[in-house]
Swiss-Prot record:
Disulfide bonds listed in the record: none
Protein name in the entry: Elongation factor G
Entries under SUPFAM superfamilies matching the protein: EF-G C-terminal domain-like, P-loop containing nucleoside triphosphate hydrolases, Ribosomal protein S5 domain 2-like, Translation proteins
A GO biological-process term: ribosome disassembly
SMART domains per UniProt: EFG_C, EFG_IV
Residue ranges constituting the tr-type G domain according to the UniProt record: 10-290
Species of provenance: Tropheryma whipplei (strain TW08/27) (Whipple's bacillus)
Amino acid sequence: MSQEVLEDLAKVRNIGIMAHIDAGKTTTTERILFYTGITHKIGEVHDGAAAMDWMAQEQERGITITSAATTCFWGGNQINIIDTPGHVDFTVEVERSLRVLDGAVAVFDGKEGVEPQSETVWRQADKYKVPRICFVNKMDKIGADFHFTVKTVVDRLGATPLVIQLPIGSESTFEGVIDLVEMRALTWRGDAKGDVKMGAEYAVEPIPEDLKQQADEFRQKLIETVAENDEALLEKFFSGEEITVAELKSAIRRLTVSGSLYPILCGSSFKNRGVQPMLDAVVDYLPSPLDVPPVNGVDADNPQERLADVSQPFSALAFKVAVHPFFGRLTYIRVYSGTLPAGSQIVNSTKSRKERFGKVFQMHSNKENPVPKMSAGHIYAVIGLKYTTTGDTLCDQDNPIILESMTFPDPVIEVAIEPKTKADQEKLSLAIQRLAEEDPTFKTEQNPETGQTVIKGMGELHLDILVDRMRREFNVEANVGTPQVAYRETIRRTVEKHEYTHKKQTGGAGQFARVIITLEPLEVTGEKTYDFVDTVTGGRIPKEYIPSVDAGIRDAMQVGVLAGYPTVGIKATLVDGAYHDVDSSEMAFRIAGSQAFKEASRRADPTLLEPIMSVEVRTPDEYMGDVIGDLNSRRGHIQSMQDSSGIKVIQARVPLSEMFGYIGDLRSKTSGRAVYSMTFDGYAEAPKSVTEEVVRKARGE
């Protein structure tokens, strides 16, 4: 059974389930796995037993962090699901999942509608042009309102919703849905928890009389919306002919795949209602690998594309590296073209290294199902890849191609971490290396002065989880400092011709190097934070020593003169110097360059730069004054305020150092009703009081 499904790509769906935290994404995925017959007992997130949440912390915290890929079958079709996290600290996970999906199910909370995080993920999906269907979940919740949620899709996302289902009953009386395409009612009666069938069986009935009129109105709207966007149906519609269910379905499919509109369904995953029709919609309306455009290589001089076809040369993208308890490195890949047996040799074209596939699996959460080969259009987990990291292309040796990779933001928050014993030190290095392979937004460095290891990430929760994983998976016992902000230093003033002579004449070979440098402030851009110019004439410093001066300056820039933070925004010009035939060396000039920079930058009015975050707060009207007052007290600049269906959306730029612990303060000020999201915006000069405080701390005063 499984083999024949694998070959016919029209029956394959690679989908993601995307949502705000707590909209019920993992629960929805669990139900899908249950109804498609993979899991025998439904895992509840409340019990910490969901099959997709396979890291210990995910099960404890009830949130999903890593996108586990899972394969299941529904009505003769194969659905590969990638579970994505909705928490903003894990943008990298969402980005990488969207990059390899063909379609997605956006899950919304029926009471809250579109929330900030859903909006962030929705925009990321727009960037990768991923077709979506929407599932309005939690229809059993008090205050759930299907029509309000549909309205938020228009107001907040600016998308065109296509309502293809209506709820029957609401809150505690929610018992099923009206299918507007086939004009019938699907009901799940008396099946609240307790019943063994777990919602696996439902009744197909005529539409209840009291809802008939509403159903007819929405059916009419549905046909009008589809006909307006589809020429073939428009003619039938105007000539008054009956549009068949099959015609309507294929038109909805075309419009969904092209991203023109988004079908909307509803249900309650937790109460086991409405999940099977959503699976039918995944098959009916979301694209197969054959419906999406071919992938292109990034080499502009040699444009190439690969079709989702087994006869094409092999190409695949690695989108995640995970550490598996038994197999070690597990690389998740999406195969775009061609086919290869397990054990084949291929080339990693991004890094120009040869690689060999070991065993190949199709995954069910964290259980593996070995398969003999990989073929186009599918998602696999493979072992045996040594050099491949997230975003790398793997391809046939004779037909190289590099596929578009993914972009990852720089980390903005750091904590010092100290192993408790010598044995922990070794385990810590291994843990850091493994975790950095998995997560491109996790960076680490050694502070040269204190010798401490510093780990950096995208937010407080992100680092908490990484430290926790070191403890659990690698048994590292370590003391963790309080979160620190990743400051930078720069200069404000030009220093002309600063001279420094390095000489040492005590027994044995001496050392001699003289350099004269000019430092100027340089505007920092994404690509450029430092510029070195050599204007030495007449061989006053031999050519072979010039790069050493540059290297010395770079060394010194790693530890700023003000508070030991990396220096950026420097243009250094080597103006002149002197050397000695015997005593000069590359080392001597490196030391001279480094010392000259340190002295000159002290005179160049050094200053501190702090990371500024772009913060968005969504709050009910009545708390707006408090929220704005609080942001102002955190040195925030309010950029804009907008109304968005009963709530105010405040956009502000706030220094990261003022945002620690913000979530708790915001909850207490707004009785837990406001939510916020923040992303890194850029660096800006820190005020004097902040600079003095940071400098004092750095000097241990």
